Regions:
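Basic, polyanion-binding surface patches
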Residues: 1-159
Length: 159
């Protein structure tokens, strides 16, 4: 039997963060939770060894939480298993025409929803991850074909 923390079936997300100038990076997030209703506040846990963490710490200008759909499953290895420090994810996504613009932000095509976020603060630093709070600025819904943690297990992408 799986460990309790691997028995969840939460949505799989990608967080788009801005880098220097006009560039951006995207990652894979599964530690994401809404924790307040008014105002709507999200908690997101970010691996401290990633470019996403660096971007959130140094340059939190443009942040979009993207709920991935089943159509995005092939992007999980690119966005989650490759480091933004050593691999240009922006170039790979744009060369394959997998992004579009939403409110001036580069986002993935075929997402279930997009949430434009404003970073409030870093609230808890742990050994390998750090928890950040974000307030919702705007959002857009698209479809209901959510990519879930269980889909990643069934397709042997994780565990």
């Amino acid at each position: 039997m799986k460990r309790p923390w691997n028995r969840t079936n939460s949505n799989v997300y990608s967080l788009m963060t801005s880098c220097e100038k006009a560039s951006y990076n995207m990652n894979i997030c599964t530690y994401v939770s809404v924790v307040n209703i008014k105002p709507k506040i999200y908690l997101i846990s970010i691996d401290k060894s990633t470019l996403t963490f660096k971007n959130l710490t140094n340059n939190p200008v443009s942040i979009v939480l993207q709920s991935l759909s089943i159509k995005n499953i092939k992007l999980v290895k690119l966005l989650g298993k490759k480091s933004g420090f050593t691999y240009n994810k922006q170039r790979a996504l744009e060369n394959r025409k997998l992004t579009s613009l939403w409110k001036g932000h580069n986002v993935l095509n075929d997402c279930c929803f997009l949430i434009e976020l404003h970073k409030l603060k870093k609230i808890h630093e742990m050994h390998d991850h750090c928890i950040f709070t974000f307030e919702i600025k705007s959002f857009k819904n698209f479809n209901h074909n959510f990519l879930t943690f269980q889909c990643l297990i069934e397709n042997k992408i994780i565990l």
